[in-house]
Curated annotation (Swiss-Prot):
Keyword presence, rRNA processing: yes
Gene: DBP6
EC number: 3.6.4.13
Pfam families: DEAD (PF00270), Helicase_C (PF00271)
CDD domains: DEADc_DDX51, SF2_C_DEAD
Protein name, UniProt field: ATP-dependent RNA helicase DBP6
InterPro entries in the cross-refs: DEAD/DEAH_box_helicase_dom, DEAD_box_RNA_helicase, Helicase_ATP-bd, Helicase_C-like, P-loop_NTPase, RNA-helicase_DEAD-box_CS
Main location per the UniProt record: nucleus
UniProt source species: Candida albicans (strain SC5314 / ATCC MYA-2876) (Yeast)
Length: 606
């Protein structure tokens, strides 16, 4: 029933070679070592036992020959036959994560192969480079560009007329009255400067034409550097227009920012109107509002010079009748427009409109004349003046404007003195030695940042010059001694060189009109480009030569000065002055400086 099992050991002992093992596998006989023989015997015994158990499970009633399944048994070259292990569920569960990774790896390889196949197909497709589609210009971008441009100039208001600062013309070449030519010659003026030429050429023909027909003419805005002769530019035409008047009425109002300018403008008008019966009044805070009202009522002036605040007080008290007003002149307009002054522009213009009599057909409309060295481009500020057909005159070599129109005189030379911040403690001494070394010992105007610093610097410089055996007279003007009498006295002494060096602040800068000033020194830098222009504009007036020096200590002040200078239009670049402090100041100078400081401290304690 059972076939006899083949025993390799038996065959080996018998020395015979089996033809067939009965499993359909040809076995090769090889010589084994003792250890290999023992291992081989154990494996054969295990194989016999497993085959014996499997054979018992077969049906003994079957008569057919048994066929063994050879799939699970394999014989290697070493006569080893291994059975396939059974699948263990615990084993699969334990290594499930590894199986999952293997599965994902297999899937990803399949996807990559698919992509490569797709790529081969796409390679045959013609490819084109990506180019942006053409887009229409956005209206918003155009608007923003326009707004940015308008904030840098006044083209949005009117087309500017440029005039060269070097232009000159004899006053006799204008159609002026004989008395005007004589008065100008008495004042020492024979030639008109650029700003005066531009304004006179524009206004004198219109004044002559208005004698026959009262057509309304456009307003005028003038941007010219400080000291260019703006006061004469508007004073001459208004006197030419009024000197034939019969009945005195308020026909001209001139607004200025400070009381010193009131005196300056009134003095110019009185000299130009000499020989006429024109009445000129100045409204100041020196007297009460009621006293001024009585004076205006008893003697009605033709021309009023005032600050905006004082004028508004009189308008609210009905002290002034504006029904005959012909000219509204705003001098130093940038400062007046930057400060509200009781909302003066709205009050004044509303008062003018309310007193217009539309029944008077043969009547001249009010013409506005605006003058400034730093004319603003702010539409909000300029719109409050309600211009009619405005015309803009810019006296400047360059036609490239900045946000604010700042210009300095053409004849002005500017210099920058840059020193390290460590030298700041010797600042008064450096200034003193600089003035001595450059022989700038008269007609010098020095600007400081405050009243206290101006007084302190005056005391220090006076002491230092005395100790250095140099006899100079040094004075100061600030808001602490700005009474009309004191101010006029000091300015007269300064003009006559009885005072050699004058120290002041920004508050007083615009009221100083001394033609003899040759040098301006910015001991402390100004707070804005506008103030810088008005500071340095105290010299180089009326086409005379002038010099401006600015002290910069440290990188911070140097950067600030560069910003100020960048916003100013000029015909010449700012020059740098190399100042060697070690050569300029000796040990003896420092000892004198320390003594002067000690004396000043002792005076302050008293």
């Amino acid at each position: 029933m059972f076939s006899q099992r083949y025993d390799p050991l038996a065959e080996e002992n018998n020395g015979s070679r089996p033809a067939d093992s009965g499993f359909g596998v040809s076995l090769k006989k090889r010589k084994l070592s003792d250890d290999e023989s023992s291992d081989e015997e154990e494996e054969e015994e295990e194989t016999d036992e497993s085959e014996h158990e499997s054979s018992q499970d077969e049906d003994i009633n079957e008569e057919e020959p048994e066929e063994e399944d050879e799939d699970t048994n394999k014989v290697d070259d070493n006569m080893e036959i291994d059975s396939q292990p059974e699948v263990d569920p615990d084993y699969i569960h334990k290594h499930q994560a590894i199986f999952n990774k293997f599965k994902q790896s297999t899937e990803s390889e399949t996807i990559e192969q698919d992509k490569e196949e797709d790529g081969e197909e796409d390679a045959n497709i013609e490819q084109h480079s990506l180019v942006p589609l053409p887009q229409p210009a956005l209206p918003r971008d155009r608007k923003l560009s326009s707004v940015s441009t308008h904030t840098k100039n006044l083209d949005w208001l009117t087309k500017p007329q440029y005039a060269s600062p070097s232009d000159k013309k004899a006053f006799t070449d204008f159609k002026s009255s004989s008395f005007m030519i004589k008065n100008l010659e008495k004042m020492g003026f024979t030639e008109a400067f650029s700003v005066q030429i531009s304004v006179l050429n524009m206004m004198l023909p219109e004044i002559e034409a208005q004698k026959l027909k009262p057509d309304r003419v456009g307003d005028i805005l003038v941007n010219a550097s400080t000291g260019s002769g703006k006061t004469l530019a508007y004073s001459i035409p208004i006197i030419e227009s009024l000197y034939r008047r019969v009945v005195p009425r308020v026909r001209v109002i001139i607004l200025v920012p400070t009381k010193p300018l009131i005196n300056q403008v009134k003095s110019t008008l009185l000299q130009l109107s000499s020989g006429t019966n024109l009445q000129i009044a100045a409204l100041k805070n020196d007297v009460s509002i009621n006293d001024e009202k009585d004076s205006l009522t008893k003697s009605v002036p033709d021309i009023i010079v005032s600050t905006p605040g004082r004028l508004v007080e009189h308008l609210l008290n009905d002290s002034i009748n504006l029904s005959s007003l012909q000219y509204l002149i705003i001098d130093e307009a940038d400062r007046l427009l930057n400060q509200s002054f009781q909302n003066w522009s709205n009050v004044l213009l509303d008062k003018i409109d309310s007193q217009i009599n539309i029944a008077e057909v043969w009547k001249l409309s009010v013409q506005k004349l605006v003058f400034s060295a730093t004319l603003t481009t702010d539409a909000g500020k300029l719109s409050s003046l309600k211009f009619y057909n405005p015309r803009l005159i810019i006296v400047n070599d360059s036609k490239q404007l900045v946000n604010e129109i700042f210009t300095v005189p053409v004849t002005l030379s500017e210099f920058k003195i840059h020193l390290g911040v460590a030298k700041n403690s010797l600042k008064p001494l450096i200034l003193t030695k600089f003035l001595i070394s450059t022989n700038k010992l008269s007609n010098v105007l020095i600007f400081t940042k405050s009243n206290e610093s101006s007084i302190r610097l005056t005391e220090l410089l006076t002491s230092l010059f005395q100790k250095l055996s140099i006899n100079l007279k040094i004075a100061f003007i600030n808001s602490t001694n700005n009474r009309t009498s004191i101010r006029s006295k000091i300015l007269k002494q300064f003009s006559n060189q009885e005072v050699n060096i004058l120290i002041t602040t920004d508050l007083i800068a615009r009221g100083i009109d001394v033609a003899s000033i040759t040098d301006v020194i910015n001991y402390d830098l100004p707070n804005s480009s506008r103030e810088y222009v008005h500071r340095v504009g105290r010299t180089a007036r009326a086409n005379q030569v002038g010099y401006a020096y600015s002290f910069c200590f440290g990188k911070g002040e140097n950067s600030w000065f560069k910003k100020l200078a960048h916003e100013v239009s000029r015909s010449k670049e700012v020059e740098n002055v190399d100042l060697n402090v070690k050569e300029l100041i000796s040990d003896r100078d420092e000892e004198i400086y320390q003594q002067a400081l000690h004396e000043l401290q002792q005076q302050a304690k008293k």
